[in-house]
C-alpha cells in the first residue's frame, strides 16, 4: 500500500529514478584499481621485488630490496611518507642488515636536532610577530608600484625562507598578498579574479559553471606564484632553510666523516646564496614577462600594470596601515631578534677556519650546529615575553595578575612543529647507513663505472636534470634520500670529488615549480588563490630552465672558488673508494664462495642419490638371483631323481 501511495504522490520523483542509469551489481576492474591502487602497490611491490633476494641472498641485495620498496612507496605515496620512512626499523634487523639499536640511532642525529631546533626558533619569530614587521618594512622601502611591489614581496619571501620552513614562509606571506590585492581591487587598480560568465536558463540570467572556483587573473597568479617560487629558492640559501638541505648534508657527512671539505653553515651560504640571488631575480623577470607584460608595452597586462603604477599610492596606503597596526616594536620582538642574530653568529663563528672559532676554545669534543640551535631554543623558554613583573619591585603601575609567558610556549610548538619530518629525515639517514654497511652503495657505485666516458660537466648536467625531474613528482626529501647515497658511491667509482655531484643534486631537489603536489609552497598558493595545475605547469617552465642553467654555471665557476679542490679526487675520497672497493671484493668473494658451496652441495647430493640408485639396482638384481636360485635348485634335484612335480601331478590325476 505504501508503495502504491509513493507512486501516486511522487510520480516525477519515480520517473527520475527510472530514467537514471542503472546501478551495476558487478564491480569493474577500472573502478577497483582507481579506488584501491594504493593497496595493490603496497601488496604487490614486495612480491615483485623478491627475485632480487633470490638472485643473491646477501646483505647488499637485501638492502637493495628494501630500497626499491621504499622508493616506490615514497614516489607513489601508497603509504604516507612518514610511515614509509619507518620501514628500516623493521626491515633492517630482521633481514640482517643492521641491528635495532644501530638503526634507531640514525633517526636522531645532529643534523636532525639542528633542523627541529631551527623550526622552533622560526616559530618563536612567528609567535612574536617579528616576521610581519620585517616583511612590511622592507616593502615600504622597496616601493609600491605593481612591479616594485612584486619584487619586494619576492625578495622578502626569499630572505625569510632562508631561516624558516618554505611552507611556513608561504603561509605567512599569502595573507599579506591577499590584503594588498584586495585594496588594489577596491581602488580599481586591478582585479583578483575574472568576472564569472553568465548564460540564459529558463528566461533567467544565471552563472555558467556555478560549481567551478573563481579563476584568478594573471596579476593574481604572478603575485602568488612569485612568493611560492621565492620560498623554494630562498630555502636553498642556508642549511636550515629546508629539510632537503639537511637531508643531503646529513647523508654526505655520514658517508664521509673524514672529509676535509665540510658543509658547515658559513660555507654552505657562500656556496649557494650567490646563485640563489641570481635565479630569484631571473625568476622575477620571467614572471613579469609572462604575466605582467614586461617588454610588451602594448599588451593588455602591461596596460593594467601602467594603471597600477599611476595608483601606487593606494598600495602604499595599505602597507602603511598594516605596519601602523603593529604598533611599536615590543620587547618580545626585540629579544627574539637578538636571539636569532646570536644563533646566526654562532653558526658563522663556530669553526670558520680563517680564524679561531669559539668551538676551538672549548674542550676537545666535537661541537656541531645543533648546540647553538638548541641553546637559543632553551633561551626562548627562559626569557620572559615582557618584564611587567618588575613592577612588584618598582611599585609603579599596575602589577600583573597572571604569570608572565616566555618568548614561546611549548603548546604552540607542539601544535605547529611537523613532527613527522623526524621520521622522514631519519628514514633517509637509516637507508644511507644501511646501504653503506651492507655494501649496496658500493655495489651500485661500481656498476656505474661505465659513465667514465662522459665528461664531468656532462655528468653533472645529467645529475641536475634527473634530480629536477624526480622532484617534480615526489617529495623533495624523499628524492634526496634516494639520489644522494647513489651519487656518493658513483662519485667514488668514477674518481670524482663527491661534493661535485652531491651539492648541486641536493640543491636541485628543491627546484620544483610545475605542480601543486611538487612542494608545499606550490600547494598552498594553488589552494589559496585557486590556481589551476595547467597554469602552474606552464609558469614553471621558465623558473625550471633558469635554475638548471644558473646552477650548472655556478657549479662550474663559483663552486670552485669555495672548494678549490673540487676538480681533484681528494685523499679522503681515495681512502673511502679503497674501502668501498675492498667491501665490494669481499661481497663478491662471499657471493662466489656461497655459489661454489651451493654447487658442491648440489653435486654431493647428486652423487649420494646416484649411489643410492646404484645400491637399489644392485640389491634388486641380487634379490632376483637369489629367488631364481632357490627355485631352480630344488627343481634340478627333482629332475636328477627322475621325478617332477608337474608329471607327478598329472600321473595322480
Where are these regions (language model features)?
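Transmembrane helical cores of multi-pass ion-transport proteins
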Residues: 2-619, 623-630, 634-653
